[in-house]
């Protein structure tokens, strides 16, 4: 008997199409798994079984009539930063505890049109600020590989639920690593598309020039199938790029012979664990065995500045974006007060957690008159230098290969009181957002029973190339097939 929760999208699709299983069965199997594991994993903010079962029923009806697309009837989860009409969307913040959006995010509509089934909304660091889900105002998600460890963040719930086989796939958002870092920590495939490839309409904004939505899946093929469904122009997002969506799954043939891959040395910094470097070296050996050429002498000298640039630009944008939470328009409101200003202050003081407040203060400072040129403008200039450096490298290479993270999943509480240590988790992922590039993290082995991720970075809008390399690697390895014992 097939273990329904272990199936990929592609495998489930085949069984659904051949009428060997129904979406209702598949959905029920996942809902049961959620019920069994959630007390331990805590990946979900909200589970919506009624919605899931009625969507599964609709999918089964469509399939009976021969109307089946790659995601029809497939149970999925969405990070709680994506607006879902009629379903609470909290961003794991007290500020939006009871916020029920009156509309769907663009990607949510797209997935609904495909017939995907929504199991629920996943836990995250508050407003996507963090690398461990410990900044959730509600609870910390556990890493399915070792429940004393964090699952990464900010999309920790979305990564954990796929790793724990509670959902076939999920969506997250990535501003500085929030998809790739938890994908690495949980040993799943996590994809950040090129900036502009997926509409941000209905994604609660953190840092708009960096945010992108992307999938968590069990392998690169599934990732391509989800990208096919969510990518594409949308005039409601002014940064959405008007170009035809490629077929992300075409070219996934396992062949990367002749591909030129560069390995930038700055990504193997002082804070990198040597046993992670070893795993990455093994992975490079696999890629070279597949016929790709590997150049380890690549240098991107501005890399060390990326973290500083990010922690000026992202908080600046956040301070502007989060000004909307004033207790008047929507969300939490504290109002037993004397006047409007006091109400606003108290709303924000009580509604936001410490990390969100820290970022708002950093951003407000960086944007304030007198400091704007010294911090914000300077960071923008360095951002351009970082982008140019990548563009130069891509004249020689088809893709760049790095570790996804400098560290292994760490213990719950370990970095919570040291924000800088937490920020350092993203040294390998942040430069990619700064330059708007596509990048994927794929499972590359284990150290002390904990997952290591490999990052493949592509040229702007060469998303298919990154996926092709990821797929080829997965044809030659089995790391992505390993699942935690739960
Ligand atoms: N949002 C992200 O992509 C994660 C990053 N760790 C941050 O805290 O900003």
UniProtKB/Swiss-Prot annotation:
Keyword annotations of the record: ATP-binding, Ligase, Nucleotide-binding, Protein biosynthesis
One GO CC term on file: glutamyl-tRNA(Gln) amidotransferase complex
Pfam families: Amidase
SUPFAM superfamilies, per database record: Amidase signature (AS) enzymes
Transmembrane segments: none
Molecular function GO labels: ATP binding; glutaminyl-tRNA synthase (glutamine-hydrolyzing) activity
A biological-process GO annotation: translation
Reactions the enzyme catalyzes: L-glutamyl-tRNA(Gln) + L-glutamine + ATP + H2O = L-glutaminyl-tRNA(Gln) + L-glutamate + ADP + phosphate + H(+)
Assigned protein family: Belongs to the amidase family. GatA subfamily.
Subunit structure: Heterotrimer of A, B and C subunits.
Listed name of the protein: Glutamyl-tRNA(Gln) amidotransferase subunit A
Naturally occurring in which organism (per UniProt): Dehalococcoides mccartyi (strain ATCC BAA-2100 / JCM 16839 / KCTC 5957 / BAV1)
Gene: gatA
């Amino acid at each position: 008997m097939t273990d329904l929760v272990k199936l990929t999208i592609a495998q489930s699709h085949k069984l659904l199409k051949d009428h060997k299983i129904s979406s209702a069965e598949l959905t029920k199997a996942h809902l049961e798994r959620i019920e069994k594991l959630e007390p331990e994993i805590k990946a979900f903010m909200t589970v919506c079984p009624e919605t899931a079962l009625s969507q599964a029923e609709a999918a089964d009806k469509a399939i009976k009539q021969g109307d089946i697309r790659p995601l029809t009837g497939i149970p999925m989860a969405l990070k709680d930063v994506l607006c879902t009409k009629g379903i609470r969307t909290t961003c794991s913040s007290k500020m939006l505890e009871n916020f029920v959006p009156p509309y769907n995010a663009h990607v949510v509509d797209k997935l609904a049109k495909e017939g995907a089934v929504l199991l629920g909304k996943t836990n995250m660091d508050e407003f996507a600020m963090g690398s461990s889900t410990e900044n959730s105002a509600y609870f910390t998600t556990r890493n399915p590989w070792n429940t004393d460890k964090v699952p990464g963040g900010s999309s920790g719930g979305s990564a954990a639920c796929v790793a724990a086989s509670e959902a076939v796939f999920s969506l997250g958002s990535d501003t500085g690593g929030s998809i790739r870092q938890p994908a690495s920590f949980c040993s799943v495939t996590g994809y950040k598309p090129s900036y502009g490839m997926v509409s941000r309409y209905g994604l609660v904004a953190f840092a708009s020039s960096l945010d992108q939505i992307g999938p968590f899946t069990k392998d690169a093929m599934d990732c391509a199938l989800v990208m096919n469904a969510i990518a594409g122009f949308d005039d409601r997002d002014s940064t959405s790029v008007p170009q035809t969506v490629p077929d992300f799954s075409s070219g996934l043939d396992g062949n990367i012979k002749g591909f030129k891959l560069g390995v930038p040395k700055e990504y193997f910094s002082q804070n990198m664990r040597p046993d992670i470097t070893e795993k990455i070296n093994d992975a490079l050996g696999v890629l070279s065995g597949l016929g790709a050429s590997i150049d380890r002498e690549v240098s991107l000298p501005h890399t060390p500045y990326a973290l500083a640039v990010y922690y000026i630009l992202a908080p600046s944008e956040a301070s502007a974006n989060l000004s909307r939470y004033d207790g008047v328009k929507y969300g939490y409101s504290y109002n037993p007060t004397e006047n409007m200003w006091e109400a606003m202050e108290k709303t924000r003081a009580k509604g936001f957690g410490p990390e969100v407040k820290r970022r708002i203060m950093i951003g407000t400072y960086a944007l304030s008159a007198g400091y704007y040129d010294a911090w914000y403008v300077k960071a923008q200039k360095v951002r351009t230098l970082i982008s140019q450096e990548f563009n130069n490298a891509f004249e020689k290479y088809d893709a760049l290969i790095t570790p996804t993270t400098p560290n292994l999943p760490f213990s719950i509480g370990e970095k919570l009181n040291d924000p800088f240590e937490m920020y350092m988790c993203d040294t390998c992922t942040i430069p990619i957002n700064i330059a708007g590039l596509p990048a994927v993290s794929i499972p590359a082995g284990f150290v002390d029973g904990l997952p290591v991720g490999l990052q493949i970075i592509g040229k702007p809008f060469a998303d298919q190339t990154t996926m092709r390399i990821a797929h080829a690697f997965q044809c030659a390895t089995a790391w992505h097939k390993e699942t935690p014992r739960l």
